[in-house]
Amino acid sequence: MKLLKPALYCTPLPQEISTQLLMRACGSAHLALVDYNLYLSTYILYDKRMTSISLKTAEDIAGMRVAGRLGSEVLDYITPFVKAGTTTGEIDRLCHEYMLNVQGSIPAPLNYCPPGYTPYPKAICTSVNDVICHGIPGDKILKNGDVVNLDITVIKNGYHGDNSRMFLIGEPSILAKRLSEITYECMWLGISMVKPGNYLGDIGHIIQQHAEKSGYSVVREFCGHGIGTVFHEEPQVLHYGRPGTLTKLEAGMIFTIEPMINAGRREIREMGDGWTIKTKDRSLSAQWEHTVLVTETGYEVLTLSAGSPPPPAFITPA
């Protein structure tokens, strides 16, 4: 998502979270607790929008490895529950409780409120069928044949771990299965271009080429992003473009690669809740996401865990 101004979090603290847990999860440098008498248990986090790309320190990278693994482990945990008959709201509740009670992390999306938006009301995003991104969990019951993207971002010790996976419910259609597979390949092809000296345009180009030669389209309005102690920072990582253009990659950069690929046309429509984005032609959409570090010789995927799907066979390990 493109964020051009500082974003504000303003979140009621759940009763089960202690101030000490919150401080450990967020990092005291990024936390301001407000008057309990006036605001009850409300905290405010400022997403300090950076105007330049930050190269992460060794300490930052260590923190991002922890947060990334935890983000992926939430997806491992929830996998058995993502099935026909389960509501997206129940999936959100289970993920939220796992973050708080097992990991000691907190969900970054909860009440995330960039300029022009209303606060996001849930802990995760659940995007079903023709929902491209930012689907809000609720009463929707998953049914056989559905496709759903679960987008998870945790905060641990002030660092963000951001990733998403596709889930196919029951017996998916051939179209749904192929769309998910091609989108997964698009993400990994983009990742394979990450190394010092390459360009952001190289990432976008290879994703666009693979999607379009497969008969699909790439969403333009939303993109990957830099990430660290800030949820969304520079650079913006487009999933389309020309090779050899945009920012040159340097060791120490960390950003997400999260292509949104539509089975039909690329145009979007915004829903009335202020968050949910759907395909304009009501075609299926898919998305996969990893957080990636640029190393001295290539890349390191930070959002891997025991349950992560393996890379496609044609991807050469970094």
What does each of the following model-derived ranges do?
Residues K2-K5, E16, D35-N37, D47-K48:
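Intrinsically disordered, low-complexity polyampholyte segments enriched for Lys and acidic residues
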Residues L22, H30-A32, L45:
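Low-complexity, intrinsically disordered segments with a bias for serine/threonine
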